[in-house]
Swiss-Prot record:
InterPro entries: Fe_traffick_prot_YggX, Fe_traffick_prot_YggX_sf. Could be a mediator in iron transactions between iron acquisition and iron-requiring processes, such as synthesis and/or repair of Fe-S clusters in biosynthetic enzymes. One of its GO terms (biological process) is cellular response to oxidative stress. Belongs to the Fe(2+)-trafficking protein family. SUPFAM superfamilies: YggX-like (SSF111148). Keywords: Iron. GO terms for cellular component: cytosol. It comes from the Bacteria. HAMAP family: Fe_traffic_YggX. GO terms for molecular function: iron ion binding. This is Probable Fe(2+)-trafficking protein. Signal peptide: none annotated.
Amino acid sequence: MSRTVMCRKYHEELPGLDRPPYPGAKGEDIYNNVSRKAWDEWQKHQTMLINERRLNMMNAEDRKFLQQEMDKFLSGEDYAKADGYVPPSA
């Protein structure tokens, strides 16, 4: 049986991550408060932001921007989107 967490983004009990995605306090916070669903969605969105905005992960400013957007995304706040992106309709 997988562990569940009260997801910060979706405000409901959902399956959690298998292990912290980062070392330290930030990783523990995500592990304890973010669902697998929200984390998987963030990883897809992160890839889109890196590609569309041509972010360079060697650049400290780009890493800081991505970290801030991750915090917003996982907290259910308004976050940066790729220019011109239209999500697929269900």
